[in-house]
């Protein structure tokens, strides 16, 4: 068996707010603390590795002899979204945050997007991805419109009903948006959010999500490994987050269970290098 590393990121799984959380409107956030009280919460393997032994973690029970090394890390980059975080893991610290749009995107930008896609745009506000379908999904179906929304992160998200806007067409619209969103409007990710269903109560997001990211501003750990002749296997969103830069093989997943299955399958493969997994 060759030398290899499995680097698995539990995306958005935090253990408490950082000192600068107020700058991002995230005071008091703690994903682990929020879910640990649920009756179905159970993570024996993470417990064995030392999750509950990490400094500052008050949820769960510590283990006397952790099987893994553990630490509490603080991000150095000025930003908190998926793109910035993964880039830092790979060695790129970002001195400036990617732009966010708490009041929606400028009207002239939306009008240009409408003209280039031939579809009316609805919403154009920060929104929950599930709530936006409840509030705008039926109108989008009636008008064959696109739902554009953002969040606290640097994202431009485009939702469309798969039966009205085929998935490849939605991907093309997102490529149009990616070309438009540069400079001051250069969001970290443009995200295609296809959905299905027939009413506000039945709409659901499908597994055909697709992210279009900015390229990292310089070489990352992935590039160095690739240049050294090592394998860099991207599982889940990793390929999209790095816009393919430094990746030698990509594995698309349809969710966390699927992602874990692919990761377990990789454990039986001979390769030398990195398996970078996003769950």
Region locations from a protein language model:
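Charged, low-complexity intrinsically disordered tails and linkers
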Residues: 157-187
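Anion-binding catalytic surfaces of enzymes that hydrolyze or transfer phosphate/sulfate esters
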Residues: 142-150, 154-155, 181-279
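Glycine-rich, charged/polar anion/phosphate-binding loops
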Residues: 71-75, 132-134, 176, 216-219, ...
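Beta-strand elements within well-structured catalytic alpha/beta cores of enzymes
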Residues: 2-16, 89, 225, 273-279
């Amino acid at each position: 068996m060759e030398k290899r590393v499995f680097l698995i990121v539990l995306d958005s799984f935090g253990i408490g707010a950082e000192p600068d959380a107020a700058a991002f409107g995230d005071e008091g956030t703690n994903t682990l603390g929020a879910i640990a009280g649920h009756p179905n919460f159970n993570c024996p393997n993470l417990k064995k590795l030392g999750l509950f032994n990490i400094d500052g973690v008050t949820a769960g029970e510590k283990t006397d002899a952790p099987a893994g090394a553990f630490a509490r890390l603080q991000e150095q980059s000025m930003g908190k979204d998926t793109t910035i975080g993964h880039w830092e893991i790979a060695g790129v610290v970002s001195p400036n945050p990617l732009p966010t749009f708490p009041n929606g995107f400028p009207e002239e930008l939306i009008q240009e997007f409408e003209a280039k896609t031939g579809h009316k745009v609805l919403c154009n506000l920060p929104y929950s991805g599930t709530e936006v379908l409840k509030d705008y999904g039926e109108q989008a179906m009636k008008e064959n419109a696109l739902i554009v929304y953002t969040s606290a992160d640097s994202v431009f998200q485009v939702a469309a009903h798969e039966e009205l806007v085929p998935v490849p067409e939605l991907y093309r619209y997102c490529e149009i948006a990616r070309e438009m969103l540069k400079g001051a409007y250069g969001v970290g990710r443009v995200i295609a959010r296809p959905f299905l269903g027939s009413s506000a109560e039945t709409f659901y997001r499908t597994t055909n999500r697709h992210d279009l990211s900015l390229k990292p501003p310089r070489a990352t750990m992935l590039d160095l490994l690739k240049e050294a002749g090592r394998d860099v296997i991207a599982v889940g969103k990793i390929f999209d987050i790095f816009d393919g830069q430094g990746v030698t093989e990509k594995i698309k997943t349809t969710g966390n269970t699927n992602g874990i299955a692919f990761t377990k399958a990789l454990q039986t493969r001979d390769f030398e290098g990195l398996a970078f997994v996003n769950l």
